[in-house]
From Swiss-Prot:
The keyword Oxidoreductase applies. Belongs to the peroxiredoxin family. Tpx subfamily. It catalyses: a hydroperoxide + [thioredoxin]-dithiol = an alcohol + [thioredoxin]-disulfide + H2O. This is Thiol peroxidase. Thiol-specific peroxidase that catalyzes the reduction of hydrogen peroxide and organic hydroperoxides to water and alcohols, respectively. Plays a role in cell protection against oxidative stress by detoxifying peroxides. Homodimer. Its EC number is 1.11.1.24. Keywords: Antioxidant, Oxidoreductase, Peroxidase. It comes from Clostridium pasteurianum. On the 2D-gel the determined pI of this protein is: 4.6, its MW is: 20.2 kDa. One of its GO terms (molecular function) is thioredoxin-dependent peroxiredoxin activity. The lineage of its organism: Bacteria, Bacillati, Bacillota, Clostridia, Eubacteriales.
Length: 20
C-alpha cells in the first residue's frame, strides 16, 4: 500500500493508496 501523507509516501503490502 502506497500512502501519501503530508507529502510523504509509504509502501505497504504492495498496494497503492493516496491519503490527504
Amino acid at each position: 500500500m502506497k500512502v501519501t501523507f503530508q507529502g510523504n509516501e509509504v509502501t505497504l503490502q504492495g498496494k497503492e493508496v493516496k491519503v490527504g
